[in-house]
Swiss-Prot record:
Residues 148-197 form the bHLH domain. This is Transcription factor bHLH25. Residues 125-152 are annotated as: Disordered. Gene3D superfamilies: Helix-loop-helix DNA-binding domain (4.10.280.10). GO terms for cellular component: nucleus. One of its GO terms (biological process) is regulation of DNA-templated transcription. InterPro entries: bHLH_dom (IPR011598), bHLH_transcription_regulator (IPR052610), HLH_DNA-bd_sf (IPR036638). Homodimer. Keywords: DNA-binding, Nucleus, Transcription, Transcription regulation. The keyword Transcription regulation applies.
Amino acid sequence: MSILSTRWFSEQEIEENSIIQQFHMNSIVGEVQEAQYIFPHSFTTNNDPSYDDLIEMKPPKILETTYISPSSHLPPNSKPHHIHRHSSSRILSFEDYGSNDMEHEYSPTYLNSIFSPKLEAQVQPHQKSDEFNRKGTKRAQPFSRNQSNAQDHIIAERKRREKLTQRFVALSALVPGLKKMDKASVLGDALKHIKYLQERVGELEEQKKERRLESMVLVKKSKLILDDNNQSFSSSCEDGFSDLDLPEIEVRFSDEDVLIKILCEKQKGHLAKIMAEIEKLHILITNSSVLNFGPTLDITIIAKKESDFDMTLMDVVKSLRSALSNFI
């Protein structure tokens, strides 16, 4: 009885080991088939030798064993014999791997590493297209910069043309006798006008060098002209002085109004001294004007007689000449 039970347990252990090994192989084959479904182009039996290795590792189908009662088939004096498996069953038998080793060996990461060359071949075109797109975006930045620079140049050119047009308009207003308003005509007439002005300036400078002081009212002798109520007296050098040494004095009376014109050399302080000498003669100055004429001063004075004024034209001229001769 103990022999039968021992044999039954040994056969039971063999069956359990074979069932466990078949379960592991079925799970491995299932994972391989699942990976083949995910990557259909990567699994080919002709190109990848690792696929054949997986097929060879599949164990042969284990035949089912039936239990035969020893009392019915064995002779009474015979001993039970152990059932020997085929040698291939011992070659394809697997050792007891841990669950972690099995999961690591046939995990999706491990399978991906096996089929990585083909996967890289499939992924590389997409990566290249992505890199090309990224490069395209980088190349678009200089194009946008060039476009903005072109717009800035266009705006600057417009402003420059506006300023140029405004200056042409201002130049056309300065040129006399302008008939046409186009730019070429404006520039041509402006050049002609500038040349004319330059020639005119040269002529005036030559006249200034050759100019001599000429007195328009020079009398060799004193004379008195009486014309109704209007009296006039002009005085010039009659004592041998040159025309430039003594001033020219002209005095006119019209009732209470007095007109005095003096032409003298231009020196500092002459105008104030002349005004002071006129006021000493009891003449009230109401208006005066001074003009520069070369190296001389042309002084014109309008005045009125005061109540205590009692002088003749000759007395006024002589008094002014004697006073001016002291400081001129």
